[in-house]
Amino acid sequence: MSIWIQNAKIATMDSANPLAESAVVVGGFFAFVGSLQNAEAYLQEHPCPDISVLDCGGEFLMPGFNDSHMHYLHYAKSKSSVDLTGCTALSEVILRMRRGFEQSYRPDSGLWLIGEGWNQDYFTDEKRFPTADDLNEITTEYPLLIMRSCFHIGVLNQKAMELYGISADTASRFGACVETDARGIPNGVVKEEVLDDIKSFLPAPSAQQLLDLLVDTQTDLFRNGITSVQSDDLKYMPADSVYTILSLLREAGETGRLRLRIAEQALLPQKSELDQFLYEKGIDDSYGNRTFKISCIKLLADGSLGARTALMRKPYHDAPDTKGLAVYDQASLDALVLEAHKNNIAVAIHAIGDGAIELCLNAFARARQEYPYLHPRHGIVHCQITDAKQLRRFKELDVLAYIQPIFLDYDIHIVTDRVGRELASTSYAWKTYIDSGVHTAFGTDCPVESFRPLPGIYCAVTRCDLKGNGPFLAEQRLTREQALYGYTAAGAYASHDEAVKGKIKAGMYADFITLDTDLLTCPAEALLHANVTRTYIDGTCVYNNVQR
């Protein structure tokens, strides 16, 4: 079916034709974008007998949002977890978990009761991590796990520690990733790679059930105008089912059951896993189809700022006994990046602290030096704490910045305390990235934050939190055009899709949305209240909430 779009303010993200009033869709692609008069002329020359008119009623139309880094499967699974976001006291965390246990937990299920989203910085009673003792008040017979909002810290009760194999006798095996008390007894707090391994250890649905969950969840994103995501999911799949699930996702894209475009950021933190992926399974960034593909290899170099596990070069300003946690030393990270690079596959590395970012930049520099004729689009995910020299190295090494503007909502209240005023003054420097020509793609890290793009756009253009507090480094404010580009065309570039999506332009996928608010001209506060009214993928409406 063909569509003639009329009566819309179209923000195209195409610098050669930034605004339009009409477009024609044929066969799932934009065939024409421009003025209404020229659209009429185009249709006279290229008749479309089956064409229908989409009268947008003067609404704002733009490309569908592209979240450049999230955890889609984790979000889908988290809908069945106990929601601990917004807890303002440790006692409230325990109360919500107790209610979840009493009201919805089935002891015969063999599953763990999971809670997600707490943040000790918001507690008004005790500003500390929960412990096993706290969770043991609920039950010691069945396994409980609660994860901090950053998902780099978790807390197990006694039963969960027993099942996973954490005890006083084994604690030393896990190093700094398992906390112990003064007696050397684990207190239930687990971090980083141990928590990641626990996620894979948990009892899980079958591969087919996971696929059903992913398909059923896509409507949540369509309601918010998201048509594409770049998602880190592999560690949320049963280890023995990863390749089955990848195959099912590819098949679901081919059959049309999966409409959301997913570019997998394949988390493969061990050399053996990467080798199996590349050489035994023969998977690379050509795997997939128009809907599901592999876009890059994903690695993690450190933890989170809120939990003080992000790796810093100097001790934390507010915790001088720690610099955070390094997942790799330089040689180990170099080896992984080099293996992907020589296969011309991009690597996107989670790095928040300036210490981790330095490791990443060094690894990319070495790979480019060894194989200068290859140009995979390496990137750093989060890239929050930086100094001026590191900001320059992003451009020098052609490293992508995957940023999450919504992080300002929380981080502006802690960053100076965590890293000191001098280093904070060159951090979250998104305008510096863009002005220097660094490809800067926006995302949310959902479910760390909500996947809703509009709050992130608000933070990007105001540098304030969602209550209007701020601004933090006002000189780093972005224009509306820059913010919308970051959530559309820049994300397409990050997944090697800039030729087919991210813009309203002839020859590109007809993935577009309409909103009841002009995002280019409305007051900043109105960004938080704008509504997506329609979402289209391949010229087909997948969400419609038009009220007139």
Regions found by a protein language model. Name each.
Residues G253-T255, G282-F292, Y371-Y373, F394-E396:
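Acidic (Asp/Glu)-rich catalytic clusters
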Residues H71, N289-T309, D398-D409:
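Non-cysteine beta-strand/loop elements that form the S-adenosyl-L-methionine
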Residues A31-F32, R534, Y543:
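A structural microfeature
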Residues D285-S286, C522-L527:
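Short proline/glycine-enriched turn/loop segments at secondary-structure junctions
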Residues L338-A348, I352-H378, H382-C383, A388-R392, ...:
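His/Asp/Glu-enriched, well-ordered alpha-helical/loop segment
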Residues N544-R548:
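Glycine- and charge-enriched low-complexity intrinsically disordered segments
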Residues S2-N7, A11, S15-Y279, L299, ...:
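Divalent metal-binding segments
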